[in-house]
From Swiss-Prot:
Annotated compartments: Membrane
Keywords tagged on the record: Membrane, Transmembrane, Transmembrane helix
Organism: Homo sapiens (Human)
Protein name per Swiss-Prot or TrEMBL: Small integral membrane protein 27
Domain of life: Eukaryota
Transmembrane segments annotated in the record for this chain: 11-31
Topology in the lipid bilayer: Single-pass membrane protein
GO CC aspect terms: membrane
Length: 55
């Protein structure tokens, strides 16, 4: 197997770190949206959230 250069390894590690950060931020944003929707349902049980009202 051909040895990999240091520059290539740095690039691969950077891309992996960026992917991990983006996935974790996506999970945080999704969880906060779910939590906000639950709180709104508790406060306003007669309203429907997360749907288009024009339909």
């Amino acid at each position: 197997m051909k040895p990999v250069s240091r520059r290539t390894l740095d690039w691969i590690y950077s891309v992996l770190l960026l992917a991990i950060v983006l996935i974790s931020w996506g999970c945080i944003i999704y969880a906060s949206m779910v939590s906000a929707r639950r709180q709104l349902r508790k406060k306003y049980p007669d309203k429907i959230f997360g749907t288009n009202e024009n339909l």
